């Protein structure tokens, strides 16, 4: 939360775009909630997505 408040003035448009994309991803995720097979697939995909985002953020920070 504090981090977002700090970089809000800096990259406001970027945050808004990311937020919209996130909501879309969440709606798609909800659709595959019942299936067990897609559940494992979703888990792997989510891990890769978060990992990519984290590495990108880390690289930018330093």
Curated annotation (Swiss-Prot):
PROSITE patterns according to UniProt: PROTAMINE_P1
Domain of life: Eukaryota
One cellular component term from this protein's GO annotations in UniProt: nucleus
Gene Ontology BP, a term: sperm DNA condensation
Localization: Nucleus; Chromosome
Tissue: Testis.
Keyword Nucleus in annotation: yes
GO molecular function: DNA binding
Signal peptide: none
Record's keyword terms, sorted: Chromosome, Developmental protein, Differentiation, DNA condensation, DNA-binding, Nucleosome core, Nucleus, Spermatogenesis
Chain intervals for the UniProt region annotation (Disordered): 1-62
Function per UniProt: Protamines substitute for histones in the chromatin of sperm during the haploid phase of spermatogenesis. They compact sperm DNA into a highly condensed, stable and inactive complex.
Family per record: Belongs to the protamine P1 family.
Protein name per the record: Sperm protamine P1
Organism in which the protein naturally occurs: Lagostrophus fasciatus
């Amino acid at each position: 939360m504090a981090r977002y408040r700090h970089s809000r003035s800096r990259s406001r448009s970027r945050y808004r775009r990311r937020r919209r994309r996130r909501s879309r991803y969440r709606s798609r995720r909800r659709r595959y909630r019942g299936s067990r097979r897609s559940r494992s697939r979703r888990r792997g995909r989510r891990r890769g997505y978060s990992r990519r985002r984290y590495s990108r953020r880390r690289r930018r920070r330093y």
